[in-house]
């Protein structure tokens, strides 16, 4: 891997960004006015712009959008510092200590809080600590959830770590994945297809009731409610199938969106002559 910048240059660039942010916070009316609440919508927008660049694999845009997201992280830290709550060093140190704690196969817990954390020798054979030995990515993921449960301020339940504000499709995937990490999953992944077909059949029956058998407005409202619930079950089961076959459903749907847009634009252009 070619090194574009030295460690010193990277640290200097980060410090340069903090210096500029400090100046903007003091001298720019717009930057000075911002709060956590006012920045939040912009943060969401910048995150989606980064996701868009990642999906399109546009390197220049990825670099640009990463900078925008990084600015927001530093901005929130600056606001926290002004309130004497925390600063960017606290953010970084908390992250590093969490990573060390959650990677016992890479770091000994004695390295938590160390200025220069030192990883364990590769393939340490005499380390009998819990979670210290892993042989696969799946084992790392399984250990991850169990380790999080042991944290002092960790999640009290398996699913409490899933943010309420996640988009529903992503949220469903995370719920299922977290449940899998504690053993709640299909014994055979092919068994999920029976569930998918069952949910589609139930949805079809409710839709037929809605459009063919419901005569009163009250009956139509009830049928629509049930059909909506059944469609949710269909979506949840399809997301489960995608997960079991190691397909990210959000990425898959976005690829289809882009494919449709490309084809539609082509048809539209031809129609215009």
Describe the role of every protein-language-model region.
Residues 1-65, 71-116, 121-231, 235-273:
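Flexible "arm" and connector segments at domain edges
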């Amino acid at each position: 891997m070619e090194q574009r910048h030295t460690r010193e240059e990277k640290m200097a660039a980060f410090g340069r960004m903090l210096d500029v942010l400090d100046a903007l916070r003091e001298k720019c009316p717009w930057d000075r006015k911002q709060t956590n609440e006012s920045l939040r919508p912009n943060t969401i927008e910048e995150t989606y712009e980064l996701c868009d660049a990642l999906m399109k694999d546009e390197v220049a845009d990825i670099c640009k959008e990463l900078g925008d997201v990084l600015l927001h992280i530093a901005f929130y830290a600056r606001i926290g510092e002004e309130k004497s709550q925390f600063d960017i060093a606290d953010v970084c140190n908390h992250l590093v200590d969490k990573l060390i704690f959650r990677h016992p196969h890479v770091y000994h817990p004695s390295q938590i809080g160390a200025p220069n954390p030192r990883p364990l020798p590769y393939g340490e054979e005499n380390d009998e600590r819990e979670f210290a030995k892993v042989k696969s990515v799946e084992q790392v993921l399984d250990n991850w959830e169990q380790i999080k449960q042991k944290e002092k301020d960790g999640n009290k339940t398996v699913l409490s770590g899933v943010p309420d504000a996640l988009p529903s499709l992503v949220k469903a995937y995370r719920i299922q994945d977290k449940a899998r990490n504690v053993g709640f999953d299909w014994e055979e992944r092919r068994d999920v297809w029976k569930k998918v077909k069952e949910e589609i059949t139930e949805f079809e029956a409710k839709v037929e009731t809605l459009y063919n058998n419901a005569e009163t407005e009250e009956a139509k409202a009830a049928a629509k409610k049930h059909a909506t619930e059944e469609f949710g079950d269909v979506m949840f089961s399809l997301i489960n199938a995608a997960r079991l076959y190691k397909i990210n459903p959000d990425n898959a749907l976005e690829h289809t969106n882009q494919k449709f847009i490309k084809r539609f634009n082509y048809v539209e252009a031809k129609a215009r002559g």
